[in-house]
């Protein structure tokens, strides 16, 4: 069993214990595939450019069915692991997402960004759904306040996943979408969440205030 745990991710066993790790993997397998989270110490602490608030940054990977592995970084207000907070998943390359996530965390929000690995919308959708499941299960994330933030080309993937998972995604944030969101929203009859369209031309400070009001 130790060799199996080492193969699928020994870090989870070291963080929560062998027995808990076995139980988590078994439960997930029975549910149609397993996922788990890995973290690499040490955590990095940075400051929000807008608020000056300290932000903890930690590498985190989510695993889905088969060989799917999605790697990224989670940003949260420093020293707030015991507090439930809304979470935003950024959908676009991390080169853009890291600054967004740092400022979102500075505004009191848990934020996660990652690089899509697969080609095509189907692969990107699968990766984002894996991240969504993982973020909803973080102990410091409020699973009833999870939002997807898409920017530019990432808007389509964010909208697709939000509309396909209406009970898991409480709201959709679109920054400079490359399509008319009304065209997609007409097809999203089951989606009960709200949609916020952000005009990036207004500036980051105004955008952050609008997003914070939206998720809180």
Question: Which residue ranges define each predicted feature?
Answer:
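N-terminal Sec-pathway targeting helices
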Residues: 4-24
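N-terminal cap/lid segment of alpha/beta-hydrolase-fold proteins
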Residues: 41-81
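Short beta-strand element of the alpha/beta-hydrolase
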Residues: 83-93
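Conserved alpha/beta-hydrolase
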Residues: 107-120
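Alpha/beta-hydrolase active-site loop
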Residues: 120-139
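Short beta-strand immediately N-terminal to the catalytic nucleophile in serine-hydrolase-like folds
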Residues: 148-150, 175
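Gly/Ala-rich beta-loop-alpha elbow adjacent to hydrolase catalytic centers
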Residues: 150-158
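The feature captures the conserved acid-bearing segment of alpha/beta-hydrolase catalytic domains
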Residues: 171, 176-209
């Amino acid at each position: 069993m130790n060799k199996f745990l080492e193969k699928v991710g020994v870090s989870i066993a070291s963080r929560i214990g062998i027995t808990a790790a076995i139980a988590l993997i078994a439960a997930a397998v029975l549910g149609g595939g397993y996922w788990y989270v890995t973290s690499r110490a040490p955590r990095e602490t940075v400051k929000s450019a807008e608020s000056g608030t300290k932000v903890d940054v930690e590498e985190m990977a989510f695993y889905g069915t088969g060989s799917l592995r999605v790697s990224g970084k989670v940003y949260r207000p420093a020293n707030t692991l015991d507090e439930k907070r809304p979470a935003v998943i950024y959908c676009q390359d991390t080169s853009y997402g890291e600054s967004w996530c740092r400022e979102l965390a500075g505004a009191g929000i848990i934020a996660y960004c990652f690089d899509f690995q697969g080609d095509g919308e189907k692969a990107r959708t699968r990766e984002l759904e894996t991240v969504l499941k993982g973020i909803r299960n973080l102990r410091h994330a409020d699973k009833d306040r999870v939002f997807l933030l898409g920017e530019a080309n990432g808007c389509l993937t964010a909208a697709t996943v939000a509309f396909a998972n209406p009970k898991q995604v409480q709201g959709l944030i679109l920054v400079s979408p490359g399509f008319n969101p009304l065209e997609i929203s007409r097809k999203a009859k089951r989606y009960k969440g709200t949609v916020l369209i952000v005009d990036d031309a207004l500036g980051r400070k105004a955008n952050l205030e609008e997003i914070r009001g939206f998720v809180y």
